[in-house]
Structures are given as C-alpha cells and as structure tokens.
Amino acid sequence: MEGIHSRTDFDLGNHQKFSGKKIQYFDPELGENYVPYVVETSIGVDRMFLAVLSNSYKEEQLENGESRVVLSIPAPLAPVKVAVLPLVKKDGLPELAREIMDDLKYDFNCQYDEKDSIGKRYRRQDAIGTPFCVTIDHDSINDRCVTIRHRDSMQQERVKIEDLHAIISKEVNLSNILKKLN
C-alpha cells in the first residue's frame, strides 16, 4: 500500500520565492524555464499492517444470540499462534497442559490460560487473533489426545498430542500466504 501525492510546483515554487534562489529547469526542446513538479511517494509496512488489522476485525452474531469479537488475522501473521487451555485447574490437567506448552513454546508464540470458563477463554483468544486453542480435558490424560479449536470456524477436532506441532506448523507457515499470491 502506497500513498502518492502530486505536489505540483507548490513546494519548490515556495522555496524559490522565500529563499530568493531560482529553482528552475530549462527545457532546451521547448526553450522554456519552469519549476519542476514534485511527486511525493510514501510506502511503509505500517500501512500494510493497518489494512490487515482493519480487514481482520469482525463482530459476529452466534446462533445462541451472543456475539463474539474475532480478529481473523491470517494465521502466519498472528502474533500468538496457539493458546493452551486446561479444562479445569485440577486433576493433573494443568500439568499436562504445561508439558504441551513446553513442547510448543520454542517454535510458536503460545499463551497459557486457566482462568474463567473455557468459553470465556476462547473468546479472549478470538479477540486477539489466536488461530488455535488447544484444550486439555480429562480424557487427554488417558488417550493422549487434545481438542484443537480453529478460531474462524470454531470447529473442534480431537488430535493426538504428538501431532499438534505438525498441525500448527502447517497452518502458520508463511508459505501458505505466499503460494496464494502466485
């Protein structure tokens, strides 16, 4: 995204006027002197990020009448890639959640959250654009599977803990966006 401003001869004309120095160009083909026009261009990453953020912000009405704020930022651009959420703060779930967090945190920016109900935690993560929430429940201890929730669709699927890294890597890889540009 770029800003382009045609300043005409305003800037150089005023500089010439107040400095007392001629800032003119002689065109030999036309045989005329004139003050050149200035075209000011401005480009920056900040404009791109503003466009992505503006386009990603959504307020959705859910079937149950509630609403949710979602920052549907593309997964490769999301600052936080995954949230690890034990269903409750007891029965060994936080310990397993911390193990999973320890496995993921070196490759992905992760958040750990055990405060409030699971629904409120999902909403908090939706609002900051976290593409994936991993929920550890009582079955996780025995079957070594967790529930991964996708932010945009709110769909949940049961996956093996050992497959989490590969699933998240595939989705947050920047090459996914780059391939769409071709």
Cite the ranges covered by each PLM segment.
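NTP/phosphate- and nucleic-acid-binding module
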Residues: M1-N182
